[in-house]
Structure formats: C-alpha cells, structure tokens
C-alpha cells in the first residue's frame, strides 16, 4: 500500500480484517497504515443470496478473504467455478472479464476480483432474463457449487 487508507464505520457495523471479524460499538474512523486484506460488511454476500452463477463465484472469492485458513480450498473451488463459467457464458465481455478476474485471484488480488464480479451483475441479469444460459445449465452450476457451501 503506497498510502494510508481511511474508512468510516457506523455504530454496530462489522468489518472483516485479515480473517478476523470486528464490530464497532460507535461511529469510528479506522486508518490502515500498511497492507491489509479487509471486506466491509455491506460487501459480504450471504450464502442464501448466492443465487446466480456470478454471485456464487463472488461468494467463493470472498471466502478467500474472509477465511484465510481455508483460502487454498476456496481458491481451488474458485478455479473449478471459473472453468465452468467460461464454458457456459457466450457473451464476449463477460468472458474477457472472467479471464481478468481469474488473473486477479491468481495474483492474490481477490478484493479487486470481487469488485470486478459485482460489475458483471447487470450483464448477468440481462443474460439470465433473456435465457441466454439455459436453466438446466444454471442448475448444473448450482449443483457443483452448493455442496461446497
């Protein structure tokens, strides 16, 4: 990190820092003075909300950050999921971004990968609404990923 990073948290808000969960009891500003892996509570996707292929990928990628002890298992599942998604999506923009996201995770930049995945949600919604990916394919992806959660 070239400069410090300052974030503000509201009373009761949680933040995930290097695998630990912290909750603040009052409004506070936190300044990170060195490299840190963190995820704000409002960016944490709950398992029951991982209802689409990209949201499932997001859930897996966030586990790399939230659970450092299980990062190896999460990364393996991420790789398996990326391969499946690259085979399912036909949209060139999505395919190019998935390849970039895979590179980010490979480089240890899972936080940036999460932001990129969130950026694909509107395109995914359009694809799913137009049934450019068949419901059977989506069900297959869910079956592959669901046991891991």
Swiss-Prot record:
Keywords: Bacterial flagellum biogenesis, Repressor, RNA-binding. GO terms for molecular function: mRNA 5'-UTR binding. The keyword Repressor applies. Transmembrane segments: none annotated. InterPro entries: Flagellum_FlbT. One of its GO terms (biological process) is mRNA catabolic process. It holds the Pfam family FlbT. The keyword RNA-binding applies. Belongs to the FlbT family. Has a post-transcriptional repressor function in flagellum biogenesis. Associates with the 5'-UTR of fljK mRNA and promotes its degradation. This is Probable flagellum biosynthesis repressor protein FlbT. The gene is flbT.
């Amino acid at each position: 990190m070239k400069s410090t990073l300052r974030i503000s948290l509201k009373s009761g808000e949680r933040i995930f820092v290097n695998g630990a969960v912290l909750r603040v009891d009052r409004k506070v500003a936190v300044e990170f003075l060195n490299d840190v892996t963190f995820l704000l509570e409002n960016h944490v996707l709950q398992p029951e909300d991982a209802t689409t292929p990209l949201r499932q990928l997001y859930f897996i990628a966030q586990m790399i950050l939230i659970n450092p002890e299980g990062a190896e298992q999460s990364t393996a599942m991420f790789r398996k999921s990326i391969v499946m998604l690259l085979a399912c999506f036909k949209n060139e923009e999505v395919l190019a971004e998935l390849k970039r996201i895979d590179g980010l995770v490979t480089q240890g930049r899972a936080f940036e990968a999460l932001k990129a995945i969130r950026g694909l949600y509107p395109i995914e919604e359009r694809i799913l609404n137009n049934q450019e990916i068949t419901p059977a394919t989506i069900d297959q992806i869910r079956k592959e990923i669901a046991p891991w959660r």
